[in-house]
Regions:
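P-loop NTP-binding site
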Residues: 148-156, 163-244
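Exposed alpha-helical structural elements
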Residues: 72-75, 99, 106-109, 169, ...
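Nucleotide-state-sensitive switch-loop elements of NTP-binding domains
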Residues: 3-12, 26, 35-100, 117
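Conserved catalytic-core segment of NTP-binding enzymes
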Residues: 95-194
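Conserved lysine of the Walker
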Residues: 22
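Walker A (P-loop) phosphate-binding loop of P-loop NTPases
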Residues: 16-19
Length: 244
């Protein structure tokens, strides 16, 4: 098979600022892929967070790896060899920056020659630190990846994201790399806390595949459907950088 026909895409969350809901985005993206008829190879590179809500907590099929072990990011490429899935979805942990930067500097061009494309997902709230984390990753990754930016309202419905829109360096980033930008709805705090406590996905609640009385309430099923639809609409808009 000629290298140019490999056609694989590796999607990974930027492991910068913690607590911005990057794992929730990855979990919902996996559900979106299922709707497209794709079952992505799943990598959990945030094993230090496994007891508190890493990818494998919600999606047990995710393979765990220690990002700080030498050669771990080569699993991006190993996963491209496994099975028939054209997509690899990896959730990175906080503090993943240096290892990722070094790997891309050494391997990204070669991977691209083999037909492997990359998409980096940056999730930000309306906090300067989470915005700066995205910009820091872009400084290192440059145009070796496509960018999907998720503006997470967190607990601020209809947030205007002034830190994102008013930061001059963000405007430079947008001009240089033309990222896809989408929004993530603010979630009711009790709903989100129980979602994480019980390691459930929006898909499970929306489809009624839960036993807990709290999540069988109609109001919470409606919430799950609404939150998921907003995310899916954003993924639909970005499908050209999410599919091979």
């Amino acid at each position: 098979m000629p290298p140019s026909t490999l056609r694989k895409r590796v999607i990974f969350t930027q492991g910068g600022k913690g607590g911005v809901a990057k794992t929730e985005v990855a979990v919902s993206l996996a559900s979106w892929y299922s709707e497209q008829g794709i079952e992505p190879a799943l990598l959990d590179l945030d094993i230090e967070n496994s007891d508190k809500g890493g990818l494998r907590t919600f999606l047990p099929a995710a393979k765990p790896f220690d990002l700080h072990e030498h050669g771990t990011l080569d699993e991006f490429l190993s996963a491209c060899d496994d099975g028939e899935s054209p997509v690899v979805l990896a959730d990175m942990g906080a503090g993943a920056g240096k290892a990722t930067y070094d790997w891309f500097e050494n391997a990204a061009d070669i991977a691209a020659e083999l037909g492997i494309q990359f998409t980096a997902i940056g999730v930000t709230t309306n906090e300067a630190s989470s915005v700066q984390a995205i910009l820091r990753w872009a400084e290192h990754l440059q145009d070796s990846v496509d960018y999907l930016i998720v503006l997470n309202e967190m607990r601020r419905p209809r947030c205007e994201f002034e830190y994102w829109h008013d930061e001059p360096r963000v405007q430079e980033f947008v001009r240089a790399f033309s990222p896809n930008v989408m929004r993530m709805d603010s979630r009711v705090e009790e709903f989100q806390a129980e979602l994480r406590n019980q390691s459930l996905t929006l898909e499970q609640i929306a489809e009624g595949r839960v036993e807990d009385p709290f999540f069988r309430l109609t109001k919470n099923k409606v919430r799950a459907i609404r939150y998921q639809r907003t995310l899916f609409a954003g993924f639909d808009e970005a499908r050209q950088i999410l599919l091979p």
